[in-house]
């Protein structure tokens, strides 16, 4: 049996651009792609913390260090510049692989610069 597990996420990125008339995708600062291991053209899930929208698209590369997080094409209808989003990618693996797998979690500031990384999510207090 294969499981679908969180491979990586960029937590609380700020949408910097929204380009309705651009070919669909999400452009992501290349530094963030490198830190997460998200490949260009890989499917990603977008969860808008600001408005609750959830959808999927594919990643394309934006200039390294630019802080760009741009939703393009139809995806631009789901967000506004300034929205806080989570960008996530999943991987399929066997149960045996899942036993030792650790995701790459990347946390950013309001300018989409990396503040820290982790491979675990803190336990939520009750």
UniProtKB/Swiss-Prot annotation:
Q: MF terms per GO, please?
A: aspartate 1-decarboxylase activity
- Protein EC: 4.1.1.11
- Principal location class: cytoplasm
Question: Catalyses which reaction?
Answer: L-aspartate + H(+) = beta-alanine + CO2
- What does the entry report about post-translational modification of this chain? Is synthesized initially as an inactive proenzyme, which is activated by self-cleavage at a specific serine bond to produce a beta-subunit with a hydroxyl group at its C-terminus and an alpha-subunit with a pyruvoyl group at its N-terminus.
EC class, as a word, reads lyase
Residues involved in substrate binding = 57, 73-75
Say which family it is in.
Answer: Belongs to the PanD family.
Q: What is this protein called?
A: Aspartate 1-decarboxylase
According to its UniProt entry, this protein's organism is Stenotrophomonas maltophilia (strain K279a)
